[in-house]
A protein has these predicted regions:
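Fe(II)/2-oxoglutarate oxygenase catalytic core
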Residues: 1-141, 148-185
């Protein structure tokens, strides 16, 4: 696992993230085939390119693209926590019961989170082991094997927790073909 605080050094990108009032409005899972195939024409794609392009703290990986989504958890929202899970191609799993996982997972916190709870807990030794517990801290980047280790978000009891999750795939997830992932414009 890699955890880097104050990851983004580009002040313009940080300001653009802070000022984009619609960043967390997008519901559902998105797909981008990467800057080598199509332009980074949205703020989310610019963020992905910043993290996984020239600023990547992780060794280079060969991928087909990026699955990404927004996580908003609050005592006032539909969801106040995220239960134990590991990331996988959900559509493929539901069709075949075969588990296909991403190459690596990413979580980034682009806004301040004045909250109680909402910790990301990663269980590298299984759900019964001790978790690695991470506070949802502004401008923090977390890179971890999202398909290998169970993880969750603990209950938010005050405030709203906001993050973007990004999975890197060496094969396009099957959900794209059936509309479970969409292309962000």
């Amino acid at each position: 696992m890699i955890v880097i605080d104050d990851f983004i050094k580009d002040q313009q990108l940080l300001d653009d993230l802070k000022n984009d009032k619609t960043f967390f409005d997008t519901k559902g899972y998105m797909w981008w085939d990467g800057w080598w195939n199509s332009p980074a024409n949205t703020i989310k794609k610019r963020l992905i390119q910043y993290i996984w392009g020239e600023n990547s703290p992780h060794p280079s990986v060969n991928v087909q693209g990026f699955e990404y989504w927004i996580g908003v958890y609050s005592e006032y929202e539909e969801r106040d926590e995220l239960p134990f899970h590991f990331d996988k191609d959900e559509y493929w799993y539901n069709q075949t019961k075969e588990i296909v996982t991403p190459v690596i997972g990413t979580v980034f916190y682009p806004w301040e989170n004045d909250i109680d709870g909402g910790y990301r807990e990663i269980y590298p030794h299984g759900q019964d082991g001790e978790p690695e517990r991470l506070e949802p801290k502004y401008n923090r980047l977390v890179i971890f094997p999202a398909g290998a280790h169970p993880h969750r978000v603990t209950k938010v009891t005050r405030g709203t927790r906001r993050a973007i999750a990004i999975n890197l795939w060496d094969k396009v997830p099957s959900g794209l073909e059936v509309g479970e992932l969409f292309l962000e414009n």
